[in-house]
């Protein structure tokens, strides 16, 4: 079968003259005497020029099997040889009238008089090409990533949600979608997130982890969950993919944020003195009249309204709607006879609020992106939740019912004290049998950010959930807490323990010491904090109204997003450890300082000036008292009928 093609006709027969085949496929041309003695052969075959004069050159140079040396071991062809070759195999004889052959001695061959060049380096493999680069100086503190070598095969589970073949097919598609995003990130020019480019082993591990999580958490709807995930992956932008990779690396290897920087935050500079900023703050005050429908309380509920609210609670027999999952359950303030506080068992929910991606002009081609929960990246409607709580919880928002638990109080006038400096405060709340109650209160001075008050608060109802993921308050904080003393420092004690007061009313009384009715009280979504403390204050500055959402109230911009956008600062980065109320209060105050600087640029261009601690309008302009506040429509979008022609 090989004879007509002659594929091996130029290859010397391994058996040489001892070959017993009548029609051997190898060459049996006479060999030169130099090949008779193998000890003289120390090089590879070099084809002479005369051997190819009568025909075209071959496509590839063929190498003979390396002969054995005197020691009996074959010399490796892969090892470069730098010394001169003493002798070479004889060239193929040129067919003629006889069996004569033309040969050239070693001294006549060009290849015998020069050194053999070393072999060319092989190209990098794909695994090496896409391996994560060395950590930068800022990431040198991170532990090395040691991804296990796993095959792309679904992990064994005690109760598999689907057949192995189905899981393997789904896993393959999931891995392919991740590889496409990883390749896209690797090709991104000028990328500063090179450590986020995963190696092949890390990609396999990430795909296995996600498939296993879906199989364990949602076995009944496993196929739907994972298929929606596969469809969603190609629609992710690079920024969204980077966030998912960071979350995976943090959970799998680092246990901290990969991009976390230990450098201190830059100090905010507005170019204004504290007195000037306080003077300009009077232009940022928002009247609350007309905002009652969005949760702002401007008057105390009457006794009749409070009694009606209590009667309604009594007739409902404790039935409430869960603030997390939306289910109905029954709550028992003071505990039921068997000691239970609620019914309904565990609560399955999503701790994060749903995120609705902004629309793009290409949505009619690529399709609109699905809304999802940032806590687990699941699309809305995929599952009932990714987190389980021990009990259901509820929240009370109606002012009349809030007053039935603890009545609202207006900020009192303190005749023995003069004007007070603006105060920025933040509250943390937890769930009890009476709803969402105050459990921590922090107040700082504005604009210096000096701590005035930081205390824990014992709620009035039995605690159902401290909401530690957001409040940052854990049971051990109450265990270590010490009773509040007015003579002690407002900060924590040396062992990290906070001071605690016995009720929300006591915490409210402490906050009133720093306020007058005309003292600007600053907060983010301040209606929630005021309602938790049961305070009615006429002079407020709310960053929700200073930085309104494009679609207006009741939609609000989050504090974390505003701080990142206007201050280039990262807050609320502790994950499951919760928020820091002091950090949030200072960040809220800095947002007001930024707005004050912007407002001063506008006022200065119109001729306004600052004398002492007061704003002086230009001649002929409206007085400061008439134009010192935001309009009543601040914070919410106007209707078309309200727009002037």
UniProtKB/Swiss-Prot annotation:
GO terms for molecular function: exonuclease activity; nucleic acid binding. Residues 421-601 form the Exonuclease domain. The keyword Zinc does not apply. InterPro entries: Exonuclease_RNaseT/DNA_pol3, REX1-like_exo, REXO1/3/4-like, RNaseH-like_sf, RNaseH_sf. Residues 99-124 have a biased composition (Polar residues). It is found in: Cytoplasm; Nucleus. One of its GO terms (cellular component) is cytoplasm. Keywords: Cytoplasm, Exonuclease, Hydrolase, Nuclease, Nucleus, rRNA processing. 3' to 5' exoribonuclease required for proper 3' end maturation of MRP RNA and of the U5L snRNA. Belongs to the REXO1/REXO3 family. This is RNA exonuclease 3. It comes from Aspergillus fumigatus (strain ATCC MYA-4609 / CBS 101355 / FGSC A1100 / Af293) (Neosartorya fumigata). The gene is rex3.
